[in-house]
Amino acid sequence: MKLYKGDCLEVMDRMIAEGVKVDAIITDPPYGTTACKWDSVIPFDAMWEQLNRIIKPNGAIVLFGSEPFSSALRMSNIKNYKYDWKWDKVIGSGFQVAKYKPMIRSEDVCIFGTGGKVNYYPIKIKRDKPIKGYAVNNSLSNPLANADKKVRTYTHKNPTNILEFKKVKGTVHPTQKPVALMEYLIKTYTNEGETVL
């Protein structure tokens, strides 16, 4: 592991100058939704220029966000936007304003990529009870239309776009994400031995 400290745009510029290319970028940029000094949105044009230069073809660019920042983020690069996950924190936040609006229990995880499809290695979920069905091109299909096909037993299912990881308490950083969530995203978008920024 190599750690860098500094302005992210300057650090990426140095890395690019050194010839560094990464397989995935997983980051939590400032959303600009608080009055905190550090919560200043990175200029989108400058950010995308660096991210697009450092990511390998088909690499995933994974960016956390919440509204209204997430909408602005997507629209800043709609050409390369792919889809969202919703991180369910299990515990709501925003008790101070719960009298005026619902507590916030989720955050967006926006996926971008410079090519067609981004590299994706879904972590299958074990089914409570296996199901049987016919498969054509790896999808369940009408058994009557596929009578000559063998019945398969499906013990696992594909993930949904909801990521349930309990929010961390007693953190070092105010927007710190759970280690388990970060591990999940790393395993979903890279293979062992690949480089993540």
Labelled PLM ranges:
Residues M1-L197:
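Core catalytic lobe of class I
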